[in-house]
């Protein structure tokens, strides 16, 4: 963990996986801006400098709290296209990439404006969207240094992206893979951002930019129409919560997997988790087994507008206690479970007045669908691939429906006031990483920097491994590997601080309002205090 990735004892802070993005947010905080304003500045730069994980062709999920501890969630999730069913064959999986996966609209830009409206109304925010995205426009137009992460994901997908002509034109200039630190320009994306700055966020959905987007998407066979874009709106909803020791954990509700994170922590709570030590085989085993119980119930989560199911019942105390009792301290549960893909970015900010925002922004898979919408420079997400084509599945495709969502930024309150902001990249890995981080922070008293630097794992299939193994970073130690194997875990050692283990960030607020925080050493990011 480098000094550049950590920050200590400040009144305000921003964290993200990109140093340039964090610097944009920190400038807003120095100028007296709110946490939401700082996050919008940070998020817009990430849409330029971290295009492999997020962009304005994707979605965003927010958790916000004022300094009194009033927590809300903003679901910036695009809905299924009205004519999307015309491209689906029942029983045949939706394509993971390409036009067939572009079945949902994109809500990131609307979420920025929605959050800014909240900031202006409730937090005294004065900054507008146009000024906040100006740094992003400048970087897209004038160029920025390509990150190691972007180069890694270009190289990792080089065989796939060779089949994405419009994508290749944008991201492999002159037909070659760029190298780390090379200056990269996104002129078409700059023009799209300029339109948003000039005409407002709704130009993306109802104006000239919407026309360009639909023209580009329809040219490759996407069913998304301008009418679909016009219906896309961010929703303010109540967060779900769980008491854990002396804090209350908050997460976004269905259709996100925020409930999976809370279920995991609820099972750990019922197990009396403080009886085991940090970093031991017991620690890893019990967290893994709690995650398995949560994931076995997670697949019923879907858009609450399309079901009468009360998903908060998943947090029933008796059920969590029963799951905890079912866990053997010496034997691992077999694990055949489908993997959900996804890559995203976590960013968060706390301002000098105590207001907080914890956000995940994503195009679903790394590089989304691989489809660039015409000459807009916008990579469209492939979130439509999260739907099922089985009409009896809770997450079956339906026009206007929100897909099951892996994004679940978190927040913890202590004494009724914001105490932790946290989140991670990693699809199925999100609840897993968060459970390890939260136990390290809350049960074992580690600092944000130390909690992030410690070894982590990823359970089940991944984009690079079709086996249902437990991938554990090698620095967990030989004794831990041996003990876990003896309990029946099928293990695969992965490198220290592996990309498979996600990129997380944490901001911690003490009772006097001072903050410390860090971004993951597995990322290119930085926490900046003000």
Predicted regions mapped to residue ranges:
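Internal maturation/activation junctions in enzymes
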Residues: 270-363, 375-376, 383
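Extended C-terminal subregions enriched in glycine
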Residues: 353, 401, 434, 443-498
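Noncatalytic scaffold domains of N-terminal-nucleophile
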Residues: 1-27, 33-200, 204-206, 211-256, ...
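Short, small/polar residue-rich loop motifs at catalytic or cofactor-binding pockets
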Residues: 236, 341-344, 405-407
């Amino acid at each position: 963990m480098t000094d550049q990735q950590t920050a200590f004892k400040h009144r305000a802070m921003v964290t993200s996986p990109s140093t340039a993005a964090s610097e944009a947010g920190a400038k807003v905080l120095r100028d007296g801006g709110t946490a939401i304003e700082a996050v919008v500045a940070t998020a817009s730069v990430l849409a330029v400098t971290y295009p492999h994980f997020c962009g304005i062709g994707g979605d965003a999920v927010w958790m916000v709290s004022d300094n009194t501890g009033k927590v809300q969630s903003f679901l910036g999730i695009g809905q299924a296209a009205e004519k999307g069913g015309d491209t689906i064959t029942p029983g045949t999986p939706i394509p993971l990439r390409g036009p067939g996966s572009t079945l949902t609209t994109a809500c990131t830009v609307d979420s920025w404006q929605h959050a800014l409206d909240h900031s202006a109304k409730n937090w005294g925010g004065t900054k507008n969207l146009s000024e906040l995205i100006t740094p992003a426009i400048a970087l897209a137009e004038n160029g920025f240094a390509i990150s190691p992460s972007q180069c890694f994901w270009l190289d990792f997908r080089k065989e796939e992206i060779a089949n994405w002509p419009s994508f290749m034109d944008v991201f492999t200039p002159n037909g070659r893979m760029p190298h780390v630190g090379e200056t990269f320009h996104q002129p078409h994306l700059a023009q799209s951002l300029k339109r948003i700055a000039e005409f407002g966020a709704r130009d993306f959905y109802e104006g000239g930019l919407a026309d360009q987007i639909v023209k580009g998407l329809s040219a490759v066979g996407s069913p998304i129409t301008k009418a679909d874009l016009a219906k896309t709106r961010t929703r303010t909803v109540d967060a779900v919560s769980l008491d854990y020791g002396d804090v209350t954990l908050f997460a976004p509700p269905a259709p996100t997997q925020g409930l999976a994170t809370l279920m995991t922590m609820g099972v750990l709570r019922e197990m009396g988790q403080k009886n085991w030590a940090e970093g031991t085989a017991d620690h890893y085993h019990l967290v893994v087994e709690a995650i398995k119980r949560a994931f076995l119930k997670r697949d019923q989560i879907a858009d609450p507008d399309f079901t009468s199911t009360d998903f908060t019942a998943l947090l029933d105390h008796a059920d969590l206690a029963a799951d905890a009792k079912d866990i053997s301290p010496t034997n691992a549960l077999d694990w055949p479970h489908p993997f959900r893909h996804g890559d995203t970015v976590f960013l968060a900010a706390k301002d000098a007045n105590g207001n907080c925002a914890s956000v995940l922004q994503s195009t679903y898979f790394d590089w989304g669908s691989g489809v660039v919408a015409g000459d807009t420079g916008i990579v469209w997400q492939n979130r439509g691939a999260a739907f099922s084509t089985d009409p009896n599945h809770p997450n079956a495709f339906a026009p206007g429906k929100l897909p099951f969502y892996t994004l679940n930024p978190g927040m913890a309150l202590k004494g009724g006031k914001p105490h932790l902001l946290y989140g991670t990249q990693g699809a199925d890995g999100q609840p897993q990483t968060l459970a390890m981080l939260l136990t390290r922070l809350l049960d074992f008293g580690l600092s944000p920097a130390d909690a992030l630097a410690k070894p982590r794992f990823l359970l089940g299939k991944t984009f690079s491994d079709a086996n249902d193994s437990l991938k554990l970073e090698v620095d967990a130690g030989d004794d831990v590997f041996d003990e876990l194997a003896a309990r029946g875990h099928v293990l695969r050692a992965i490198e220290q601080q592996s990309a498979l283990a996600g990129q997380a960030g944490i901001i911690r607020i003490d009772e006097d309002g001072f903050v410390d925080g860090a971004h993951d050493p597995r990322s290119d990011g930085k926490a900046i205090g003000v």
